A protein has these predicted regions:
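Conserved N-terminal phosphate-binding loop of PLP-dependent enzymes in the Aspartate aminotransferase
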Residues: 1-154
Length: 154
């Protein structure tokens, strides 16, 4: 009953929270004019891709990178790529870094953040490489391989 009443009524929200969106847009445009954001994103993303790719190569692994500098997607070039990604995520969490198969570069990222990430990856990748070579990846993952895709629980 109440939902039907709301459905048929006209409510203007011009002076409610909808002022937040345009205000944020104006602030974003001002920031984009004052800072070369695309250049920063390209630099940070390149440092991330190059650094992680080089570390992986030293361990005999290949990581492929895709996407725009602001949205880097990474995947291990291996038949059990999802399992390797899961192991990498678990071990990086133990180093205090939450990682997934994507890196979303932002203006807030600086060299020190990439340095910290690469320092942790340098500790973790030897085990990931060993697991890939010995084939015991699944034994090293405490709660199973990550789920891919999206599905409703109901």
């Amino acid at each position: 009953k109440f939902m039907e009443a709301a459905q048929s009524s006209f409510i203007s929200s011009s002076y409610w929270t909808e002022g937040v969106g345009p205000t944020a847009a104006v602030a974003t445009l001002a920031k984009l004019k004052s800072v070369n954001v695309p250049s920063h994103l390209a630099s940070i993303s390149d440092r991330f891709r190059t650094g992680l790719g080089d570390l992986a190569k030293t361990q005999g692994l290949t990581i492929r990178f895709y996407g725009h500098p602001a949205i880097t997607v990474l995947t291990f070039d291996h038949p059990q790529a999802s399992a390797l990604q899961t192991l990498f995520t678990v071990r990086m969490l133990e180093e205090g870094i939450l990682v997934s198969s994507g890196f979303y570069a932002s203006l807030s990222h600086h060299e020190k953040h990439i340095d910290r990430f690469l320092e942790a990856a340098d500790k973790v990748l030897p085990e990931v490489s060993q697991a890939a070579k010995t084939g015991d990846i699944l034994k090293r993952i405490p709660n199973g391989v990550k789920h891919t895709g999206f599905s409703r629980l109901t």
